[in-house]
C-alpha cells in the first residue's frame, strides 16, 4: 500500500525527521526559505512503511511533515469523498 509524505513550509530544517526515518524516505535539500538554509524532502515515498516516526520527531507546533496512509492519502488531497 502506498503512502504519501507531505512536507509543509513550516519546516525549520532541523533534520529530526530525516534521522527518525528507518527507511531513508526523507532527505534534506537546499532551500533559502528557512533559517537553516535547508528543508526536508521526500523523494522515496515508495519506501515509506507508514510508521510516522518522522511526525513524532518533528519539533514544530504544526507538524511540518505528515504521512497519509493508503486511502487516507486520497481523502486528504480531496480526491475521494
Curated annotation (Swiss-Prot):
Keyword Magnesium in annotation: no
Entry keywords, A to Z: 4Fe-4S, Chloroplast, Electron transport, Iron, Iron-sulfur, Membrane, Metal-binding, Oxidoreductase, Photosynthesis, Photosystem I, Plastid, Repeat, Thylakoid, Transport
An annotated Gene Ontology molecular function: oxidoreductase activity
Disulfides per UniProt: none
Residues noted as binding [4Fe-4S] cluster 2 in the record, renumbered to the chain: 21, 48, 51, 54
Domain 4Fe-4S ferredoxin-type: 2-31, 39-68
Catalytic activity: reduced [plastocyanin] + hnu + oxidized [2Fe-2S]-[ferredoxin] = oxidized [plastocyanin] + reduced [2Fe-2S]-[ferredoxin]
Protein name: Photosystem I iron-sulfur center
Organism from which the protein derives: Ostreococcus tauri
Amino acid at each position: 500500500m502506498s503512502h504519501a509524505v507531505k512536507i509543509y513550509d513550516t519546516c525549520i530544517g532541523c533534520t529530526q525527521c530525516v534521522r527518525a526515518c528507518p527507511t531513508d524516505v526523507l532527505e534534506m535539500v537546499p532551500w533559502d526559505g528557512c533559517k537553516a538554509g535547508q528543508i526536508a524532502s521526500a523523494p522515496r515515498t515508495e519506501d515509506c512503511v507508514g510508521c510516522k516516526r518522522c511526525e513524532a520527531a518533528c519539533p514544530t507546533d504544526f507538524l511540518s511533515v505528515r504521512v497519509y496512509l493508503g486511502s487516507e492519502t486520497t481523502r486528504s488531497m480531496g480526491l475521494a469523498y
